[in-house]
């Protein structure tokens, strides 16, 4: 149904039919009661700007172009996005709607765009199009109970309502972690003040600032791995790591890390972001001996607190990732689509991980060992035990077969020198 047809049908209903009681909404700065109408499902279309699926929509449109909810194929794509955003919860809600019908009224514009109720409407359409659905179940889904906004509702009014009644209050089916960051930035770009975003999203002023800062880091992360606009490429657990990174960046900018001179602030911040982005992408786990906070946040000592440790760590990380070649994202998008695209992008990430993981693990472990050893500097017995254990782990057969032993010889000279220093300290203590 085209826009003009939707407007005419909805208008004819709003002038004649009212269902039940009204719904109170905060609209244009006032709390008003709006009547609820029963609108045929064919008069509705998805809101492609829906905050619940912002990351999926932005990723799709970056790869394939703008989604048009009036087109059946694009409408189906949006429905799949809504369902996949929280499949277990959607499965339960669909069963509830099939049994009891729509329980909560939605909000639509005068031309049928869903402001609040995209998820519910998609499940109702799913039931209507299900050949195995019971006729009574389908009958419960033929009309959508909803408030209809005035014709003069602006895009800003619509975004304000969506934010207030979904991101601000909808805890029944939580949004994915990334959506609130993208939504806050969308609101800022559409002219909402920090105070307005705070009010409509139900956040504090400082939380809104943080949402916008992390939204910028999300884009920086995607740019770092050549995935600009592909928001589905963020790995699970990214949120906590980016929040830690954001806190560390603020410390650098405030000059709170004593060893960093003013002339190096930008360089250290740039290195920190690039390092952290690569370790987020590497997706190391605790069982690998990895703690992201060891890089920048551990209270008892982290890599960023010590100039020598930081410089060595950055150099070792740089050596690990330099010269690693990857297929361009554009080339992958040109030859793959849909589920195939997701598989190819996952394959690209996995290939990168295989190339860098051993060296990046070593870079992390070396820095971690130095920090740990500094904590134990008053415990020489423990440190020497680590040396013994490490030397016992050397495979002498491997050493024998090595053709170039230059680096090993240099390391043995350094070990010998250090042991002589320890022996001198022991002998001196005995005199």
PLM region spans:
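Intrinsically disordered, low-complexity basic tails/linkers immediately adjacent to helix-turn-helix/homeobox/MYB/SANT
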Residues: 226-263
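Charged/polar low-complexity intrinsically disordered segments, enriched in acidic residues
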Residues: 331-410
């Amino acid at each position: 149904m085209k826009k003009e047809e939707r407007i005419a049908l909805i208008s004819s209903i709003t002038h004649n039919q009212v269902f039940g009681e009204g719904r109170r909404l905060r609209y244009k700065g006032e709390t008003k009661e709006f009547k609820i109408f029963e609108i045929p499902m064919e008069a509705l279309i998805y809101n492609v700007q829906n905050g619940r699926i912002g990351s999926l929509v932005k990723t799709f449109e970056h790869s394939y172009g703008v989604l048009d909810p009036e087109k059946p194929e694009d409408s189906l794509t949006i429905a799949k996005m809504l369902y996949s955003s929280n499949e277990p919860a959607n499965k339960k809600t669909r069963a509830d709607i099939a049994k009891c019908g729509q329980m909560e009224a939605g909000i639509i514009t005068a031309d049928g765009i869903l402001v609040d109720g995209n998820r519910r409407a998609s499940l109702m359409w799913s039931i209507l199009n299900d050949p195995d659905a019971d006729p009574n179940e389908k009958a419960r889904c033929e009309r959508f109970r909803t408030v209809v906004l005035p014709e003069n509702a602006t895009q800003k009014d619509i975004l304000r309502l969506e934010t207030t009644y979904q991101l601000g209050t909808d805890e029944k089916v939580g949004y994915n972690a990334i959506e609130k960051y993208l939504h806050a930035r969308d609101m800022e770009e559409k002219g909402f003040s920090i105070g307005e975003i705070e009010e409509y999203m139900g956040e504090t002023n400082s939380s809104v600032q943080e949402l916008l800062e992390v939204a910028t880091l999300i884009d920086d992360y995607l740019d770092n791995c050549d995935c600009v606009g592909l928001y589905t490429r963020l790995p699970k657990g990214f949120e906590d790591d980016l929040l830690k990174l954001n806190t560390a960046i603020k410390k650098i900018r405030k000059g709170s890390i004593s060893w960093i001179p003013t002339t190096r602030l930008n360089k250290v911040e740039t290195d920190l972001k690039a390092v952290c982005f690569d370790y987020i992408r590497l997706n190391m786990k605790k069982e690998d001996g990895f703690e992201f906070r060891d890089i920048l946040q551990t209270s008892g000592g982290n890599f960023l607190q010590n100039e020598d440790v930081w410089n060595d760590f950055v150099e070792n990380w740089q050596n690990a990732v330099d010269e690693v070649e990857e297929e361009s994202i554009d080339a992958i998008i040109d030859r793959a689509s849909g589920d195939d695209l997701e598989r190819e992008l996952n394959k690209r990430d996995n290939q990168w991980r295989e190339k860098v993981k051993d060296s990046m693990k070593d870079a992390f472990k070396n820095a971690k060992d130095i920090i740990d050893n500094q904590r134990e500097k008053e415990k020489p017995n423990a440190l020497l035990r680590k040396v013994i254990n490490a030397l016992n782990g050397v495979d002498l057969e491997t050493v024998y077969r090595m053709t170039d032993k230059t680096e090993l010889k240099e390391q043995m000279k350094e070990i010998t020198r250090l042991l002589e220093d320890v022996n001198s300290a022991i002998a001196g203590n005995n005199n």
